[in-house]
């Protein structure tokens, strides 16, 4: 029997404790879980890709079966095929997330019918945490320590120094 390989993607700009919770839970479901940082090279991100990748690798270092990868200008299903992943993992906070994700699931299934999407519901304590919300708090100088892993906080602080 072949290994169960999953792929969880996002921009992780920045990674939140909600992302971390989904990744930790998903890592128990798969032999190998890839965490893919997907980004649009034509958009200005909050944190540079290198900082995001380094922060995620530190935050996920305790998970032996998890590997962080980065991609741009590629479809998720193409990256999944390249990595041998047959499952896409998505986190859901609310009904709006489900509706948003359902359209991607439709297209992904059209492009690769052998790849399934697995949905994990956010824990109640993470329902209202989002990367955009964290960026908004930072914009106004607010403390975000309770919303992001320590390694992400370090990357944000280091980026502000530069």
From Swiss-Prot:
Q: Which UniProt keywords apply?
A: ATP-binding, Coenzyme A biosynthesis, Cytoplasm, Magnesium, Nucleotide-binding, Nucleotidyltransferase, Transferase
| Gene Ontology process terms (BP) | coenzyme A biosynthetic process
Q: Where are the transmembrane segments?
A: none
Query: What Gene3D superfamilies does the entry give?
Result: HUPs (3.40.50.620)
State the CDD domains in the record: PPAT
What are the subcellular locations of this protein?
Cytoplasm
The pathway where this protein functions is: Cofactor biosynthesis; coenzyme A biosynthesis; CoA from (R)-pantothenate: step 4/5
* Recorded GO MF terms: ATP binding; pantetheine-phosphate adenylyltransferase activity
- Positions annotated to bind substrate: 11, 43, 76, 90
Instruction: Give one Pfam family.
Output: CTP_transf_like
Reactions it catalyzes: (R)-4'-phosphopantetheine + ATP + H(+) = 3'-dephospho-CoA + diphosphate
What EC identifiers does the entry list? 2.7.7.3
Instruction: List ligand-binding residues for ATP.
Output: 11-12, 19, 91-93, 101, 126-132
Write down the position(s) of the site called Transition state stabilizer.
Answer: 19
Task: Name one cellular component (GO) term.
Answer: cytoplasm
InterPro entries xrefs = Cyt_trans-like (IPR004821), PPAT (IPR001980), Rossmann-like_a/b/a_fold (IPR014729)
Which cofactor does the UniProt annotation name?
Answer: Mg(2+)
Biological role stated in the UniProt entry: Reversibly transfers an adenylyl group from ATP to 4'-phosphopantetheine, yielding dephospho-CoA (dPCoA) and pyrophosphate.
**Which family does the record claim for this protein?**
Belongs to the bacterial CoaD family.
Q: How does it assemble?
A: Homohexamer.
Q: What is the name of this protein?
A: Phosphopantetheine adenylyltransferase
Organism in which the protein naturally occurs = Streptococcus pneumoniae (strain Hungary19A-6)
């Amino acid at each position: 029997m072949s290994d169960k390989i999953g792929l969880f993607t996002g921009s992780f700009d920045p990674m939140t404790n909600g992302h971390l919770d989904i990744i930790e839970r998903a890592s128990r479901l798969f032999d190998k879980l890839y965490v893919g940082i997907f980004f649009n090279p034509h958009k200005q991100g909050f944190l540079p890709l290198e900082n995001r990748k380094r922060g995620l690798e530190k935050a996920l270092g305790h998970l032996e079966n998890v590997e962080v990868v980065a991609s741009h200008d590629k479809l998720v299903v193409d990256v999944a095929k390249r990595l041998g992943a047959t499952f896409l993992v998505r986190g859901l906070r609310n009904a709006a997330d489900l509706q948003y994700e359902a359209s991607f699931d439709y297209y992904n299934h059209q492009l690769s019918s052998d790849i399934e999407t697995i949905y994990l519901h956010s824990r109640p304590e993470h329902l209202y945490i989002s990367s955009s919300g964290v960026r908004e708090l930072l914009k106004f100088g607010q403390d975000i320590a309770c919303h992001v892993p320590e390694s992400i906080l370090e990357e944000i602080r280091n980026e502000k120094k530069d």
